[in-house]
């Protein structure tokens, strides 16, 4: 690449395939104008290696680094504002999922420093979903351990165990779903930003959870259209001690209520932010087929806080008991 009055750049691509693995690498070298110099020697690499090893393990490795923060974007090689290098090993079988991950992020924004570029060394996760004592029961077990450094100024370790039992009872067109679970976590927070109100300490937390819900699907059909409506109501309880002011919220900070997590027992889906209290979740989903319009899907729902302190991510005003209304609509026309 030649840039008039701004220098030259070279991009080299290399690919190699083997029976159970492949390598795909791009190397960038340049002598170009940067915000520091009229001509600066810069380089970057984006290399991916994937392999299938052992008994069902998939290993993916990526090295993605740049010697200078802006040249990849300025010369339109890559528009990313951060580069992530990682090693991930995964295995999935009928009932179990294993994941081992180590990663490092290089921030390319002017505000990024070594204190805000997260490094994970490592993150180990195990999940098993199997039958319970009854045919309608399911038991989910999760075990995870993580060490993360420089996550917006935090250095911390977390060990977590989660067990959840689900049961389903069908009675006369009404489906009753019962869930119980317990999450146990142990934290070791080694460092925090100067302005953080959380603690630098070793902390533990035990969070029991339970919910009961009902669904009542109703089907209607005509000559050229059909529709299935499913009203749903759930009551959920989250117990234990509220430690949200003590524990840094790193894995649930981006939580927002939506259709996918509205009825989950732990709808934050992370472990750092667990707020005790009770709530009522309600919604109606619809699936319709019309000869003229095609396939139509829709949902509307909300959550109401019955007890406990407000949770972030539910409403614009966190003091409201009623969450924001969650709604979606999808139309897939049938083409002739």
Predicted segments with their positions:
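Outer-membrane beta-barrel proteins and related beta-barrel translocases across Gram-negative bacteria
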Residues: 1-336
